[in-house]
Amino acid sequence: MKRFLHLLLLLALVPSLLALPPRLRAERPGPVVLLLDAEALREEAQSQGKSLLEVLESYRPLGVRGVAFPERLVKDWVGQGELLYRSGRELLEAGLPAKPNWYYLRGNRELLELLQAAYDLPHEWVGPWLGFPLDVQAFPAFYPLEEVRAAKEAGFFVAVRPINQRYRRLDASLPIVPKEADAVVFAGLEALGYPYRLEEAQERVPVPVALIEGTPQPGLAAYREKGILRLFSLRYEWQLTLTPEEAADKYVLAARERGHQLLYLRPYPYRQDTEHLLRRIQEGLEASHIPLGHPVVREFTPSPLRLAAWVGVVSGLGLLALGLSVYGPGVAFLLLLLALGYAGSQAGALLAALVFPVLGFLGPRNGLWMWLRTLGYALAGTVFLSALGSTPETILGLQAFKGVSLTLLVPPLLVALSFLDRNYKETLTRLFLHPLRLGEVALAGMALALLLLALLRRGNEAPLVPDLELKLRSLLQDLMVRP
């Protein structure tokens, strides 16, 4: 029976390997664009008495080919001097027939007319003042459209960041996504139109949307037909704790190892640091042969051959059932139920990750050959996992792999179970009566500490990162291995 299962496993490897090239082509890095945040750059422009476009042009030789415009709030226009903002009580005391519990705006007439149509709220004009019954200072209020046009005419890749707000109107006449935009990067923690107006909002977005690494945005999957571009950014507070070299290495790693196409940057307080950051990114991208340019939406059609990997996974599950001397079939059946119930459509990939690292330990424990056998099974499991995990959702980053914690816990438990023989009660009794030694306790404690560290480090934002791990990551990165 074992020979038959091994034969099936080997036969399943061939179509599974043939199913991988489409995924490799779809995940090929580049082209990428360096996007500077327009509002973060504005302080530098104002301090030098220059326009935003002039400062952008000064960064073009350093690889910057794009600019992102976050949508402004009403209070941003007030702070810039384009609008005046007064409560109704103030206007009433000034002799105007305003409503005391309303709020009023005055200033740029073109902008006021846009705001009049922007919100699903009652409004009124009191002379030159536009009034609303709610305090609209934190309401979305479009973009500096002249700067958007100028950046586009200068050849920059333009991204806009609309804000989702329950009172905003999604009207085609409003510049929610200006026609100059090349991509949309939703601001905040949810996509435009979420939760009840996604269908209407999709009509306002004619360009690809960005998937921000590490920032789930409910409703984003509804825009899949528009095209998905993967974006990497560092939270600015965290960026300030990093040197330009450290930050640049993270951007290069994101483009090289995770296929990010939009690198979203905010300048450091000192221009010298920003220039150093950009130079380092350019050098890293060139060394990795990743071109700068206009990012394109990745198209991926899974190969039907990937389904053959299920034969390999089921064969591996059968080998596990036969290899465990205690409750082997029961354990294999429970793993199958766990994978189907927890991971759903990703059950095959999860089973490959849980089962194949263990198979090498189920045969004869003959030193080096056991480890070589274990390596072979693990590589086969990697092929099956990659084949079954090759779906458009995973390639685009819309669906994360389910079961990372299980892959850290279950294989060691299965290996421990493999050491029990059929007379497991006698083995457990002997283990219970075994006299403890200080060295054994120390080794067990070290093993538990390492397991705990692995669990803590499984996510993208872990609570602790030892210095030794950072040094190891840096070394692996220099050797072109993803840490």
Tell where the protein language model's regions lie, with residue ranges.
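Soluble extramembrane regions of membrane proteins in the secretory/endomembrane system
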Residues: L24-P302
